[in-house]
Amino acid sequence: MFTGSIVAIVTPMDEKGNVCRASLKKLIDYHVASGTSAIVSVGTTGESATLNHDEHADVVMMTLDLADGRIPVIAGTGANATAEAISLTQRFNDSGIVGCLTVTPYYNRPSQEGLYQHFKAIAEHTDLPQILYNVPSRTGCDLLPETVGRLAKVKNIIGIKEATGNLTRVNQIKELVSDDFVLLSGDDASALDFMQLGGHGVISVTANVAARDMAQMCKLAAEGHFAEARVINQRLMPLHNKLFVEPNPIPVKWACKELGLVATDTLRLPMTPITDSGRETVRAALKHAGLL
């Protein structure tokens, strides 16, 4: 469940900005039918930053309900205050989720020791498997391989989503962790190379709109068929890149609407609708991928 193509699913909303259950069900059904390995609910792409804690928990529980055991659900539970992250994580202790994705604290930029103590404290307050999430371009701090190696020895910490796009990190981390520590890419454009170096899969934005292709690419890579996987990846490469032509999840939410997967591409401020130029750029990438 912690391998292959794991979608960082969008949180669909109606025109008033309320979570749209019907669109979420349609998305989940799409991922079940497409072979997606698991769903990350309310991560960065799921607009965690603009949902309050009650809404956050409600979306995760709604996702679990709609998934109905057909696909594993991972909850995004990160926060920049350790006590807050613990509280959010503990909401899901007996919920049925299979694990938590916990981002490094953002804005306050803790030291490596602070990061170690933060994640250790969270892991000690739950029995849920914890996946570390390193995305310094968003958080302002970088979880270094040496710290990952220390954290890998903590009970319940089972893997990392590495979203730096720095492929040297794969071997650096592999040298410091056990073979069963899960290495997941958080960068679609380099995910195949990440897997070829020994990674286990990707937590993907692209999978929101190209679920079957991403699942097949990861399956081929896991089986060692990298030439065949690369054919798929090259077709998707413009999409990997252009889904970030404007801040995530603006482009991917619009793409989901364009493909009829959600009813609207409504976002909450400070996220604003995609621009005309952004729309045309993403549409061209969808066509290149064979999705339009």
From Swiss-Prot:
It is an enzyme of class 4 (lyase). This is 4-hydroxy-tetrahydrodipicolinate synthase. GO terms for cellular component: cytosol. Its EC number is 4.3.3.7. The keyword Lyase applies. Keywords: Allosteric enzyme, Amino-acid biosynthesis, Cytoplasm, Diaminopimelate biosynthesis, Lyase, Lysine biosynthesis, Schiff base. The gene is dapA. The record marks 44, 107 as: Part of a proton relay during catalysis. Homotetramer; dimer of dimers. Is allosterically regulated by the feedback inhibitor (S)-lysine. Is inhibited by pyruvate analogs such as 3-fluoropyruvate, 2-ketobutyrate, glyoxylate, and beta-hydroxypyruvate. Is not inhibited by its substrate, (S)-ASA. It catalyses: L-aspartate 4-semialdehyde + pyruvate = (2S,4S)-4-hydroxy-2,3,4,5-tetrahydrodipicolinate + H2O + H(+). Changing residue 161 to A: 0.1% of wild-type activity. 3-fold decrease in affinity for pyruvate, and 2-fold decrease in that for (S)-ASA.
